[in-house]
Amino acid sequence: MLSIDHVDWLELIRVTLHPLAKFPGPKLAGASYCYEFWYEVICGIQYTQKIIKLHEQYGPIVRINPDELHFNDVDFVDVVYTAGARKRDKSSHYLAGFGGVSKSTFGTLDHMHHRTRRRALNKFFSKSRVLQIEDSIHEKSQQLCDKFLAYRDQGPFDLTGAFSCIATDTVTEYCFGSSPGFLNQDGWEPNCKSYFETIERMAHVTRHVPWILYLAKWLPLSIIRLVSSDLNSFLVDTRVKKPERLKRVVLDAERHDAKDCPVFLELLNSDLPPREKSKQRFMYEANGATLAGSGSTAIAMSNIVYNLVANPRIGHKLRSELLGKVSDPKNLPRWSSLEELPYLTAVIHEGLRSMYDPSKERLPYDPSQERLPRIATEEELIYKDGSTPGKSKYVIPRGYAIGTSAHVVHSDESIFPNASQFNPERWLGRDGQRNRELERHLLSFSKGSRYCLGMHCRCTTCLALPASVRNGTRGY
């Protein structure tokens, strides 16, 4: 009885005296995490869709759980997702679903700690550094096209799984100096698509029931295999394969010159503090890089190719533009030339914008399109709402999470009219060139000091693949 009374008092305080109690939103969402749990776990990852409806009901800023706000105002994006000296921590509730990912750069809670880890990685994923592996990306793109041709008469296959093969091979080879060789195998299985999706879906459960992660950590693989083959594959990769690759990187160090040195070998030789170079931390860093570098890239490319086939007019227009630039699929132009093609760039942007499928029927689940909360630790944020009479200003107290979702912004009809339609022309100005103003609202890579580290690598792959698929297979 005492514990029940305690819960009742806690919920009452949350909706009356809590610093976020003044913000609009369902009282149940403010009182308890059960509201979020219902839509995330029981309803099957549907909270983002529910949040869209909450904004329609309550306005551009909504309290979505006891300690977190969600906003839907593009003018406020650069305030929350800021760069420079303004500190932004991540939310411990958000990161709880990822377990040991806190040891990776992506999962680092504290702003300054993140800066230390991020600084060590930035140079490896800069545009100039990614250009050094552009030839490798082009070779793998052509290899993928050759494989498409070889398997074209052998029935349907999972397109996202196929793109997962090239994405995983690319990022793993760059980080470790060797890859799983998914493109070299017969067929498209195995690949990382299935177990990555399982892990990402599990995060919504373990965020509320974290002890599941600790149980999975200590259970033997023989038992895990009986529960979930995908989870078993992920743990085998984490516990066995990645440690073997890292060990091989160290043992074969003398075979790599400075230019071709794998990322993790350079990190081992960097000026990071010794505690940041532990094998366990590098395993989590590797998991983060592989998950981010392959899953989202595969989904984006699958979405783009699907829409090019489903919309012959768009495919024909892109094909016409590529004919003037790409004469030989085995000798693709450089990134700098491909990104000058306005319609190709527009197709890529539209593919990134529309890569979230709420039904999960056409495209796999992609967590990068959902909310990414931030916490301002040293300042109060001022939000001015001109759409709600009498409530034109909110003061968001320091220490509480606030964020938005890429999918929510990308579905905003005031920014992207007919948002449910795949329409690359929206990214072009009247002169047929890139609409730079609209590109400011693309949040597929997040923004600010914690924007996606692999952005340039993904962009290079996304630019190369449509050109290769079009010329190498005479596709779309």
Curated annotation (Swiss-Prot):
- GO molecular function terms listed in the Swiss-Prot or TrEMBL record: heme binding; iron ion binding; monooxygenase activity; oxidoreductase activity, acting on paired donors, with incorporation or reduction of molecular oxygen
Per the record, a Pfam family?
p450
Which residues does UniProt call coiled coil?
A: none
Q: What is its EC number?
A: 1.-.-.-
> Per its UniProt record, what Gene3D superfamilies does this chain match?
Cytochrome P450
The metabolic or biological pathway listed in the UniProt record of this protein is: Secondary metabolite biosynthesis
Query: Which PROSITE patterns does this chain map to?
Result: CYTOCHROME_P450
The broad enzyme category this protein falls into is: oxidoreductase
* The keyword Transcription regulation appears for this protein: no
Lineage: superkingdom: Eukaryota
What functional role does this protein have? Cytochrome P450 monooxygenase; part of the gene cluster that mediates the biosynthesis of pyrrolopyrazines, secondary metabolites showing insecticidal activity. The role of ppzE within the pathway has still to be determined. The single multifunctional NRPS ppzA is sufficient to produce peramine via condensation of 1-pyrroline-5-carboxylate and arginine, N-methylation of the alpha-amino group of arginine and reduction of the thioester and the cyclization to form an iminium ion resulting in release from the peptide synthetase.
Sequence similarity: Belongs to the cytochrome P450 family.
This protein is called what? Cytochrome P450 monooxygenase ppzE
